[in-house]
């Protein structure tokens, strides 16, 4: 299950009928500005920059315009079909774009270099709908197109570079407009989002740039035009603060259909060399996007998958790995690749907490909740790869009560190497039985092991309940709590018209973090020097309120903070290398070695979309 804002596999957007409805609704709600009666008015002889205006919303939204002229700079024959036009004679205002998208719904009949005149309606299209919080795209809809001439030179591109993009990300949203920036005058010399908005629809170019987001299944990648902006050691751009965004990131797509020219495969750290040029679009999945008419060449910089050190005899190695909806119907190749990573890249950890193990029938919604076949297929693959014969513990969830892919019943599972560590089974619990902490002579113990933490708490509604287990290594008890907190689904993107964007999903994770924190406090209250590890897909950053709640009272420390800033990430989303997966330690875990093992997130070819985490210490 993707941990950042999810999207469906189908990227084609049917919007010809939706455009007017969206705009009318937005105008009525006062979200986009303009007059709801403007559709009854006409405007003749206007230029593109008149339509674009000096804010994010056209001053002519809803109006019928006639005689709008420009040169075609790009044609899109798939997805949101249409073409871009640009006025070759720019005005003197840097806030007004000279380019504009023309939505045709069917395959356009114009070609790049055509000079055209259009009669159309000015609309504001919100990719993803009003509830997404996305900015709107100013466009012409229902066009009547007249080709005036052909073979004209395309207007010279505006170069987007480290020097042209401001370091400040966005203005603070207008409190009177609910935190929206829609009505604020653009200041392209002060803010990156304003700069990109001032180029909406314009023919732009970038020079050779570093890839910071690998090619994905939707034929897109991310680059940065700011080579030294929060650079990671492996070539990415680390995301380290809500207050300091990475303004050099830019999404790249191609206007050439894949059947004619495959999209290049790139990993983080590769170079997109030469010139990449085309109209600047705005879409639901990343905001401002260079839709390339001319696409540069990817140069492989040889990024390699990392391998962690093997634990010493007296060290306990604990790892966490989100294996992305693993179920028995997945190809054997996926199981083998994941198993090879456990053995080779993770050096066969003593305890491995897995997230997103699905039930025995996967996404088939047939009431199955057991996952023994899924786990057996995986542990068999690990043995075949030369790894240990792991044993396992888990608690089956209630059917369709823990979120994730419907029917899949994802859950956390403990694997452990019985040659190195033992598991303390104690009144094994079920999906609704809560484990608690008890004590005897200064030592803590779980009432149920494996058991779930506070499963009736509403914080876990439609979400994975934490799995707590009690292990023994060299005579010392170690408590491990495997987690998979609620996803970021529903959060607004970084390019939202709300600045700062709304992060609504954070509220649930905050409650989840408080529940886990309270449980750890119970353990530490009974055994001050207890070894407790809270591991898993926390789905939130090391600087987030979620992590702050987990660490409340000093009972936990986010081990990822022991790494240099440029190594703190487990996931790459929209060109940001960021932390989602974590291992947190109790005060009893005094000395440890931590490793975020980068084997997936930076690569176009992934076994999972997450990087596993490993912590080694001496209990």
What is each residue range found by the language model?
Residues 34-36, 140, 211, 423-424, ...:
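A broad structural signal for short, well-ordered beta-strand segments within beta-sheet-rich domains
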Residues 41-317, 321, 325-351, 432-435, ...:
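Extended non-catalytic accessory segments flanking core domains
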Residues 14, 44-50, 373-377, 557-558:
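Secondary-structure junction/capping motif
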Residues 289-619:
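Divalent cation-coordinating acidic motifs and surrounding scaffolds
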Residues 22, 27, 31, 162, ...:
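Conserved beta-strand scaffold positions in the cores of enzyme catalytic domains, especially
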Residues 9, 131-132, 401-404:
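Intrinsically disordered, low-complexity coil segments
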Residues 1-40:
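Secretory targeting and sorting signals
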């Amino acid at each position: 299950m993707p941990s950042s804002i999810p999207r469906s596999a189908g990227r084609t957007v049917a919007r010809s009928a939706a455009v007017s409805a969206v705009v009318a609704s937005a105008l009525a709600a006062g979200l986009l500005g303009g007059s709801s009666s403007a559709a009854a008015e006409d405007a003749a002889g206007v230029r593109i920059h008149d339509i674009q205006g000096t804010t994010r919303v056209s001053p002519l939204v809803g109006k019928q315009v006639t005689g709008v002229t420009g040169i075609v700079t790009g044609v899109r024959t798939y997805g949101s079909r249409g073409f871009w036009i640009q006025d070759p004679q720019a005005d003197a205002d840097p806030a007004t774009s000279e380019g504009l998208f023309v939505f045709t719904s069917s395959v356009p009949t114009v070609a790049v270099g055509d000079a055209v005149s259009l009669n159309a309606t000015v609309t504001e299209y919100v990719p993803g709908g009003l509830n997404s919080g996305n900015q709107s795209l100013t466009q012409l809809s229902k066009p009547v197109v007249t080709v005036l001439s052909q073979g004209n030179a395309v207007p010279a591109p505006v170069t987007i570079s480290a020097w042209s993009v401001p370091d400040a990300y966005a203005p603070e949203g207008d409190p009177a407009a609910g935190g929206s920036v829609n009505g604020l005058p653009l200041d392209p010399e002060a803010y990156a989002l304003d700069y990109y908005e001032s180029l909406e629809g314009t023919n732009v170019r970038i020079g050779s740039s570093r890839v910071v987001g690998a090619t994905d299944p939707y034929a897109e990648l991310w680059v940065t035009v700011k080579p030294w902006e929060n650079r990671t050691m492996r070539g990415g751009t680390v995301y380290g603060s809500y207050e300091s965004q990475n303004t050099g990131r830019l999404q790249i797509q191609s206007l050439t259909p894949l059947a004619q020219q495959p999209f290049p495969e790139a990993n983080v750290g590769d170079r997109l060399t030469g010139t990449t040029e085309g109209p600047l679009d705005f879409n639901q999945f990343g905001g401002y996007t260079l839709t390339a008419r001319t696409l540069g060449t990817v140069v492989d910089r040889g990024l390699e998958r990392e391998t962690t050190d093997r634990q010493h005899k007296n060290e306990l190695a604990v790892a966490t790995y989100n294996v992305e909806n693993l179920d028995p119907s997945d190809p054997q190749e996926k199981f083998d690749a994941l198993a090879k990573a456990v053995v080779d890249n993770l050096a066969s950890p003593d305890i491995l907490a897995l997230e997103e193990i699905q039930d025995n029938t996967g996404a088939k919604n047939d009431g199955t909740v057991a996952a023994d076949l899924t786990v057996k297929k995986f542990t068999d693959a690990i043995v075949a790869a030369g790894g240990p014969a792991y044993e396992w513990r888990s608690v089956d969830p209630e059917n369709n009560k823990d979120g994730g892919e419907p029917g899949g019943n994802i859950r956390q599972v403990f694997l452990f190497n019985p040659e190195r560590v033992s598991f303390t089974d104690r009144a094994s619990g079920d999906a609704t039985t809560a484990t608690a902490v008890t004590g005897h002579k200064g030592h803590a113990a779980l009432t149920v092991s494996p058991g779930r933490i506070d499963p009736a708490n509403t914080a876990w509604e439609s979400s994975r309940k934490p799995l707590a287990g009690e292990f023994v290594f060299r005579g010392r008890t170690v408590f491990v709590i495997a987690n998979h907190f609620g996803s970021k689904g529903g959060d607004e993107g970084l390019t939202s018209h709300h600045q700062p964007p709304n992060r609504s999903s954070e509220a649930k994770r905050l409650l989840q973090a408080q529940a886990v924190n309270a449980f750890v406090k119970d353990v530490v209250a009974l055994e001050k020097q207890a070894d407790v590890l809270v591991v898993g897909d926390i789905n939130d950053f090391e600087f987030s309120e979620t992590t702050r709640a987990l660490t409340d009272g000093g009972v936990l420390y986010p081990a990822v903070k022991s790494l240099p800033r440029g190594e703190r990430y487990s996931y790459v989303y929209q060109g940001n290398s960021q932390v989602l997966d974590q291992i947190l330690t109790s005060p009893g875990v005094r000395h440890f070695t931590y490793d975020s093992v980068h084997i997936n997130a930076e690569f176009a070819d992934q076994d999972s979309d997450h990087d596993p985490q490993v912590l080694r210490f001496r209990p």
